Amino acid sequence: YRYQHRGNALKTRYRQYWDNSELNAAIYTASVETYKKNRELVAAVDANYAARIGNGWNVNMRLNRASQDTFMRRYKFDSSTSLKSEVVAEKLDTERYYRVEASDIQGLSSSDTSETDPTVLPHVFYEKIGPGLRETQTVKTEISAIQVDNDEGHDMSRWTGNVELSDRIDTGGIITEVKTGIIGSYYSVQKKPAGATTKTDDMDRVTPQASIGWRAPVSLAGSSRSIVLEPRLQFAYIGGKDRSADIPNRDSADYRIDEANLFLLNRYQGYDYLRPGSRADMGVSAVANDALVGDVTGFVGASYRLSGKPSSGLTVNDDDNLSDIVASLGINPEMP
């Protein structure tokens, strides 16, 4: 690449395939104008290696680094504002999922420093979903351990165990779903930003959870259209001690209520932010087929806080008991 009055750049691509693995690498070298110099020697690499090893393990490795923060974007090689290098090993079988991950992020924004570029060394996760004592029961077990450094100024370790039992009872067109679970976590927070109100300490937390819900699907059909409506109501309880002011919220900070997590027992889906209290979740989903319009899907729902302190991510005003209304609509026309 030649840039008039701004220098030259070279991009080299290399690919190699083997029976159970492949390598795909791009190397960038340049002598170009940067915000520091009229001509600066810069380089970057984006290399991916994937392999299938052992008994069902998939290993993916990526090295993605740049010697200078802006040249990849300025010369339109890559528009990313951060580069992530990682090693991930995964295995999935009928009932179990294993994941081992180590990663490092290089921030390319002017505000990024070594204190805000997260490094994970490592993150180990195990999940098993199997039958319970009854045919309608399911038991989910999760075990995870993580060490993360420089996550917006935090250095911390977390060990977590989660067990959840689900049961389903069908009675006369009404489906009753019962869930119980317990999450146990142990934290070791080694460092925090100067302005953080959380603690630098070793902390533990035990969070029991339970919910009961009902669904009542109703089907209607005509000559050229059909529709299935499913009203749903759930009551959920989250117990234990509220430690949200003590524990840094790193894995649930981006939580927002939506259709996918509205009825989950732990709808934050992370472990750092667990707020005790009770709530009522309600919604109606619809699936319709019309000869003229095609396939139509829709949902509307909300959550109401019955007890406990407000949770972030539910409403614009966190003091409201009623969450924001969650709604979606999808139309897939049938083409002739």
Language-model region placement:
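Outer-membrane beta-barrel proteins and related beta-barrel translocases across Gram-negative bacteria
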Residues: 1-336
